[in-house]
Amino acid sequence: MTLQTYNDLTTAIGNWLQRSDLGALLPNFVQLFEACANRRLRVRQQEATAELTPGNGVVALPSDYLGWRRLTWTGNPRQELGYVEPSWLQAAYPDLPTDIPRVFTIEGGNILTMPLDPGNTALELVYFQQIPSLAANSTNWLMSQHPDLYLFGALTEAQAYTLNAETAALWKARRDELFEEIEKLSNKTRGPGAVRVLSPTP
């Protein structure tokens, strides 16, 4: 059978497990794998762009944010902001000056920029986006391009639940191989000199 949708995946998991009593738990296995994938993957298919409007140098991160790649002030001329640690930002700008923002940091669920922009010009954030939930969307880019990762990832979670350590280790090894292959492919398809990631998730 093909593996293209959420229903295809849960059917395949049930077939591979050969355990009819686990049907109600199949969505949990998929969800647990997606949580794992969101912690692990940072590839180009996850990149998204959001326009954010700050207020007094503060703006909330997107709800599906995993990590940043670039933050740009969209005034004229556009200016890319540099990342600094929160403690550095506070120490360097104690008087809260106003000017074109030059640096930013992340505290909690917010981006903080300095100097403060009196015009509250929009910021363009290029960031890594969470993998869209397969249960909520039927399919997504990861399922379309790498259904084997979804299958072996969910099987790993299922075998952990059944306390089958030997089989869980087998599927986990295959899952991790696929993670590495996808990460290498993402780097390769960016092109030479374009593989640098500016920062992990703060």
Segments from the language model and where they lie:
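Glycine-enriched, solvent-exposed interface loops adjoining structured elements
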Residues: 1-202
